[in-house]
Amino acid sequence: MPELKIKTEKVEKQLTKEPLVLKTPKEKIDNSGKFYATGKRKNAIARVWLKVGKGKIVVNKKTIAQYFPSETYVKTILQPFVLTKTIDQYDVICTVRGGGISGQKGAILHGISKALDKSAPDFHVILRKGGLLTRDSRVVERKKYGQRKARKKTQFSKR
């Protein structure tokens, strides 16, 4: 019993010495008032800047319709705005490198979601429930030696 008393006294002394201060992370906002975030998917990395505007989206100095030919890609990229009901309220400027079209689409989607989360903290719960803030960590499995592909093996003959 006396050991417990000594330990609790030590803990109480430590707590009374230094007040507990929670550090809030600095939001990535540049001088012009844009929210910055990076999104990743497969080998693609997207840098996204979000600012209050009229809903214009620019990807690598092209409009979103010019960069992504398929309408389904555009709809999936606009998903965070649909969930948070902020369509035509933010302008998006992003640069994407690496990967293919599908990976770039996922990277932009992830970056926009993270930037929206920084712009308004009440969007966090909505975006988290939609699964847009979690990074999709699936990447291509490497090819193993002695095999044709990552999982495919050469034909086996018993005799």
Curated annotation (Swiss-Prot):
Species of origin: Rickettsia massiliae (strain Mtu5)
InterPro entries: Ribosomal_Su5_D2-typ_SF, Ribosomal_uS9, Ribosomal_uS9_bac/plastid, Ribosomal_uS9_CS, Ribsml_uS5_D2-typ_fold_subgr
One GO term describing the cellular component: cytosolic small ribosomal subunit
GO biological process: translation
Transmembrane segments: none
Gene name of the record: rpsI
Name of the protein in its database record: Small ribosomal subunit protein uS9
UniProt-recorded Gene Ontology molecular function terms: RNA binding; structural constituent of ribosome
Top-level taxon of origin: Bacteria
